[in-house]
């Protein structure tokens, strides 16, 4: 894996959709990143209930969705680990692979939740935090500087694109027999149909 300015976008991606891809591209362009790693989680510690589709299906959908963007790279670094997908561990592993200029892309609501994350101070040592705000949504982060005094120097806030798409909604639409085309790439739609996912 080559070094350089690298964005990290993790998530369940259950399924991946244009909202995820648009955020990754927006951050890549604005911050002049060399690439963005899309990292499907095996199991997210702060999201009880787990994913609906298997790790293998979610990885395959992410690869299909990112196939036409040379700046996106899908990583199986969390899928291959048996333990929960702790961000601090993932960043440490990437650091050990020679990636020293990391930009962790999070929704601004997740930034507000950082004090609950495992080894959050180590996360801030290993990566810049890119907080992506939903247009029109205000989240107060002023309290975080008291709990995490190093955060303001590591935080980059940007406004995200206006795309109101959620994986939960896509799963519900599939279950109801409603279309999801134009909300996720056609290759992902075809994969979901071919594998009978979310029915």
Swiss-Prot record:
Substrates-to-products reaction catalysed: nicotinate beta-D-ribonucleotide + ATP + H(+) = deamido-NAD(+) + diphosphate
The EC number(s) this enzyme carries: 2.7.7.18
GO biological process, one term: NAD biosynthetic process
Keywords of the record: ATP-binding, NAD, Nucleotide-binding, Nucleotidyltransferase, Pyridine nucleotide biosynthesis, Transferase
SUPFAM superfamilies for the chain: Nucleotidylyl transferase (SSF52374)
Domain of life: Bacteria
InterPro entries the UniProt entry points to: Cyt_trans-like, NadD/NMNAT, Rossmann-like_a/b/a_fold
Pathway the protein takes part in: Cofactor biosynthesis; NAD(+) biosynthesis; deamido-NAD(+) from nicotinate D-ribonucleotide: step 1/1
UniProt similarity note: Belongs to the NadD family.
Alphabetized HAMAP family for the sequence: NaMN_adenylyltr
The protein's name: Probable nicotinate-nucleotide adenylyltransferase
Source organism of this protein record: Roseiflexus castenholzii (strain DSM 13941 / HLO8)
């Amino acid at each position: 894996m080559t070094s350089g300015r690298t964005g990290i976008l993790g998530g369940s991606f259950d399924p991946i959709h244009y909202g995820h891809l648009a955020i990754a591209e927006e951050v890549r362009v604005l911050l002049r990143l060399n690439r963005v790693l899309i990292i499907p989680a095996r199991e997210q510690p702060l999201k009880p209930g787990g994913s609906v589709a298997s790790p293998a299906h979610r990885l395959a959908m992410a690869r299909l969705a990112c196939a036409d963007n040379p700046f996106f790279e899908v990583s199986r670094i969390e899928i291959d680990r048996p333990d929960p997908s702790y961000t601090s561990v993932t960043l440490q592993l990437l650091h050990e692979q020679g990636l020293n200029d990391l930009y962790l892309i999070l929704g601004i609501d997740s930034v507000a939740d950082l004090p609950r994350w495992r080894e959050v101070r180590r996360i801030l040592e290993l990566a810049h935090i890119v907080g992506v705000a939903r247009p029109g949504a205000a989240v107060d982060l002023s309290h975080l500087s008291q709990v995490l005094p190093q955060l303001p120097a590591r935080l980059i806030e940007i406004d995200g694109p206006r795309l109101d798409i959620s994986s939960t909604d896509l799963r519900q639409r599939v279950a109801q027999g409603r279309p999801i085309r134009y909300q996720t790439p056609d290759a992902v739609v075809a994969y979901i149909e071919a594998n009978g996912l979310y029915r």
